[in-house]
Curated annotation (Swiss-Prot):
GO terms for biological process: ribosomal small subunit biogenesis; rRNA processing. The gene is rimM. NCBIfam families: 16S_RimM. InterPro entries: PRC_barrel-like_sf (IPR011033), PRC_RimM (IPR056792), RimM (IPR011961), RimM_N (IPR002676), RimM_N_sf (IPR036976), Transl_B-barrel_sf (IPR009000). Its main location: cytoplasm. Binds ribosomal protein uS19. This is Ribosome maturation factor RimM. Transmembrane segments: none annotated. Belongs to the RimM family. It comes from Idiomarina loihiensis (strain ATCC BAA-735 / DSM 15497 / L2-TR). It comes from the Bacteria. The keyword Chaperone applies.
């Protein structure tokens, strides 16, 4: 694997059975798409590249057998490991689509030019994602945090990846 930013896409769970199968917790939108990435870089105390030999759905979860792991004891050493891929393995997005990791840390400015702060995290909701913007320490309206719905063309008017800035139609005092 190339030296590139690592993205955690899942975690190895408990051992399943005696033949080296492991439960897999996927963080991908479609849980099964975690198996489209290969090899996985398992990160625990050390890092180790592993290939999935086979996988299947089990009850409401996923289980997998990894190359070179053939018994319960070998599998147990991997429990709790993060499943990582490199950022360049992520699928390309349309111009109006963004990975959360790319939005976090961006400066948010409203259409009046007021610096609202920096995206600290993103909250998923049933209807849309919400930007959690940490306000500047000298915010003129005494805000410490703003919650701004990430709805493009309604509240989010522009995202400039190169300038690391999001422009929003949002009142400065809200």
């Amino acid at each position: 694997m190339q030296q590139s930013e690592q993205i955690v896409v899942g975690r190895i769970g408990a051992v399943y059975g005696v033949k080296g199968w492991l439960k897999v917790q996927s963080f991908t939108d479609d849980p099964e798409s975690i198996f489209e990435y290969s090899p996985w870089l398992l990160s625990q105390k050390t890092e180790r590249e592993m290939k999935v030999v086979e996988w299947r759905r089990h009850n409401n979860g996923l289980i997998a057998r990894l190359e070179g792991i053939s018994d319960r004891d070998e599998a147990a050493r991997l429990t709790g490991a993060d499943i990582c891929i490199t950022a360049d393995e992520l699928p390309a997005l349309a111009d109006d689509e963004f990975y959360w990791r790319d939005l976090i840390g961006m400066r948010v400015v409203n259409t009046n030019g007021y610096d609202m702060g920096v995206v600290e995290q993103i909250m998923p909701t049933a209807s849309n994602d919400v930007l959690v913007v940490k306000a500047n320490s000298n915010d003129g309206f005494g805000k410490s945090e703003r919650l701004i719905p990430f709805i493009q063309s309604e509240y989010v008017t522009a995202v400039d990846k190169e300038a690391k800035q999001i422009q929003v139609e949002w009142p400065s005092d809200f």
